[in-house]
Curated annotation (Swiss-Prot):
Inhibited by FK506. Ca(2+) 2 binds at D550, N552, D554, K556, E561. This is Peptidyl-prolyl cis-trans isomerase FKBP9. Residues 492-527, 537-572 form the EF-hand domain. Keywords: Calcium, Endoplasmic reticulum, Glycoprotein, Isomerase, Metal-binding, Repeat, Rotamase, Signal.
Length: 574
């Protein structure tokens, strides 16, 4: 049920001295003392173990009773009306014997009371109901006590060690509760609905006692709030489950707290000493996170998926609170971002995130880049003689360690015990590496940082390189073999023989077969007269050269077909 405020009226004026109904129901009575039928007698048939409060003169009580004569004949019962008897004690609103008998009772205590005529209805009796000079017996069960001077009572039975913030007026809260009467009878529970009660505090959305009882609570705190009826639903009750003049007891556990004026809060957990760059709007981030509610309830984690969350920031791809909270982070930084619901998933929530929930994200930034980034090169060592620099077409042998920006090692040629060998500028490595190996001399050591759009992109390499990852390569160039001029796969180191075809055609039949051609080219390379492009399959180069000369494709080259490159620009051979 909703704990909403109702219009409140002060306690009613005193009841009549003799509480009689036209229906013939007499006011319940009880007494205090022992002795004969001429004295008030009380038998305490049940006393609860805990009795924090007893009835005093001036208190207002709610109790059930059964009234009988000594022979057992019933003359009245509150149970028959399915309603407690509600009255002030010690103010003359009851017969004297009952006024005395109720004093000292505990809630849930049961008393059997014998009231002599002089403390009941005396020699007059009640016409048609109670004969003159009747001894009256009452079986009384006390349900409720309060006093018009009572205030809200608060008992905190659990308080978390850390309490950075407490409920203030105008805060919005989410809490669970069990609502009972003073006798322990449950009338409502948010737990049964499996949904928190969500409301503003101190602006009249709640009954006055709850508005007051919630103030000062911490998230995670548990407290008992006891509310007298004039700060709850008053003399009329709520018209459904709560009777009039009922004291209410709420066992409250606070789960969440925020104010509509709140922004995000950021707590830096780990900030690297070296932070050369901080994230800005438009950057693309890869980060891990654990997501919890304010009370610690887990709702999501990138770690459980074994994959970072990858997104642009500052462009509306994530909730506003995270968009803001990820600005200004360093690579490797860990921070806690607390996001109020109006900067999170709002009143509706999403999935297992309830509506109006404050969210807590523990973030670990793995890397970030900007789509406009190029590679970054830092040279750590250059030999004294660093005049021959790598260029397109050169054949390179180098060692490297490949890692992510957070230091996670991906690959290492040193661990494999062999160099990595490529021809520069022929797409044998990712574009960023190709760029990073340019203008490098043998013996040089450098670090190349490659953004994903110049590396392995959004897809990455399954099981090896995460998607959208910035890569860091520590490189040492060990060997450089100069390449050939662009467009050539073979060049002569000296003058070309005027009788080149005849030299290749050793058998003099006027036709050169692939075997003859291959043997001749390899002989020229071996003698230093010619040079094949380094880093490529020599046989494939020779075969391509032969194919280019074999213009009719009959598997042999004639003198008519044979041309040098400078004689036939359409072909790359020789």
């Amino acid at each position: 049920m909703a704990i909403r405020a109702r219009s409140w009226r002060p306690p009613p004026p005193p009841l009549l001295l003799l509480l009689l109904w036209v229906t013939g129901q007499a006011a319940p009575v009880a007494g205090l003392g022992l002795g004969s039928d001429s004295e008030l007698q009380i038998e305490r048939r049940f006393v609860p173990e805990e009795c924090p409060r007893t009835v005093r003169s001036g208190d207002f009580v709610r109790y059930h009773y059964v009234g009988t004569f000594p022979d057992g004949q019933k003359f009245d019962s509150s149970y028959d009306r399915d309603s407690t008897f509600n009255v002030f004690v010690g103010k003359g609103q009851l017969i004297a014997g009952m006024d005395q008998a109720l004093v000292g009772m505990c809630v849930n205590e049961r008393r059997f009371v014998k009231i002599p005529p002089k403390l009941a209805y005396g020699s007059d009796g009640v016409s048609g109901v109670i004969p003159p000079d009747s001894v009256l017996h009452f079986d009384v069960l006390l349900m409720d006590i309060w006093n018009s001077e009572d205030q809200v009572q608060i008992h905190t039975y659990f308080k978390p060690p850390s309490c950075p913030r407490t409920i203030q007026v105008s805060d919005f809260v989410r809490y669970h509760y069990n609502g009972t009467f003073l006798d322990g009878t449950l009338f409502d529970s948010s737990h049964n609905r499996m949904k928190t009660y969500d409301t503003y505090v101190g602006i009249g959305w709640l009954i006055p006692g709850m508005d007051k009882g919630l103030l000062g609570m911490c998230v995670g705190e548990k407290r008992i709030i006891t509310i007298p009826p004039f700060l709850a639903y008053g003399e009329d009750g709520d018209g459904k489950d709560i009777p009039g003049q009922a004291s209410l007891v709420f066992d409250v556990a606070l789960l969440d707290l925020h104010n509509p004026k709140d922004g995000i809060s950021i707590e830096n957990k780990v900030v690297p000493e070296n932070c050369e760059r901080r994230s800005q709007s438009g950057d693309f981030l890869r980060y891990h996170y654990n997501g919890t509610l304010l009370d610690g309830t887990f709702f999501d984690s990138s770690y459980s998926r074994n994959r970072t969350f990858d997104t642009y920031i500052g462009q509306g791809y994530v909730i506003p609170g995270i968009d803001e909270g990820l600005l200004g982070v360093c690579i490797g930084e860990k921070r806690r971002i607390v996001v109020p619901p109006h900067l999170g998933y709002g009143e509706e929530g999403r999935g297992n995130i309830p509506g109006s929930a404050v969210l807590v994200f523990d973030i670990h930034v793995i890397d970030f880049h900007n789509p406009s980034d190029s590679i970054s090169i830092t040279s750590h060592y250059k030999p004294p003689d660093c005049s021959v620099l790598s260029k397109k077409g050169d054949y390179l042998k180098y060692h490297y360690n490949a890692s992510l920006l957070d230091g996670t090692l991906l690959d290492s040629t040193w661990n494999l015990g062999k160099t990595y060998n490529i021809v520069l500028g022929f797409g044998q490595v990712v574009l960023g590496m190709d760029m990073g190996l340019r203008e490098m001399c043998v013996g040089e050591k450098r670090t190349v940082i490659i953004p994903p759009h110049l590396g392995y992109g959004e897809a990455g390499v399954d099981g090896e390189v995460p998607g959208s990852a910035v890569l860091v390569f520590d490189i040492e160039l060990l060997e450089l073999v100069a390449g050939l001029p662009e467009g050539y796969m073979f060049v002569w180191n000296g003058e070309v023989s005027a009788n080149l075809f005849e030299e290749i055609d050793k058998d003099g039949d006027g036709e050169v077969l692939l075997e003859e051609f291959s043997e001749y080219i390899h002989a020229q390379v071996a003698s230093g007269k010619g040079k094949l492009a380094p880093g490529f399959d020599a046989e494939m180069i020779v075969k391509n050269m032969f194919t280019n000369q074999d213009r009719n494709g009959d598997g042999k080259v004639t003198a008519e077909e044979f041309k040098l490159k400078d004689q036939e620009t359409k072909h790359d051979e020789l």
